[in-house]
Amino acid sequence: VGSEMCIRDSYGPDPHRYFCGSPYDDESFGCYAPVIREALEKIIGAEYTVTDETGMTTDELVEKYIDQGMPVIYWACINMRDPIVGPQWKLLDTGETFTWISNEHCMLLVGYDEDSYYFNDPYENNGCIRYPKTVVEDRHKAQHMQAVGVVRKTVIQ
């Protein structure tokens, strides 16, 4: 039997549609912005708008949200570790090959100063943590520049 007979394709969920694994398992992968947007829309109520802001730069997110007093859900790498090209699998829905970028993590971008961005990060009870701007922007790009914003709808009287 040739070795090609032993190779099997791995299939898995699309992180744009599902959480890959369990949020309670350290070995799980995670999910991407559309999943968080959809979950928030189900629970947040009619007075807020939830927007997938994937593709926006950190500067654009700061201007649109932070400067207006609203935090933004922000994808980067856990503890700003280097991104690592992770495992690949075929998506169950499409058969397309997907490559996970390991060290994926999302947290809440809450502020900035001249040199740093500030995040509320639940990982290991980090609390409010500061990272250098250049590192943050690099890690955000590595995770496909994903973000989710939430704003209160304006009521016209």
Segments the model singles out, each with a brief description of its role:
Residues 33, 37-41, 59, 63, ...:
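Extracytoplasmic/secreted envelope proteins and their assembly/folding machinery
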Residues 49-51, 71-76, 108, 118-120:
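Structural recognition of the beta-strand scaffold that forms the well-ordered cores
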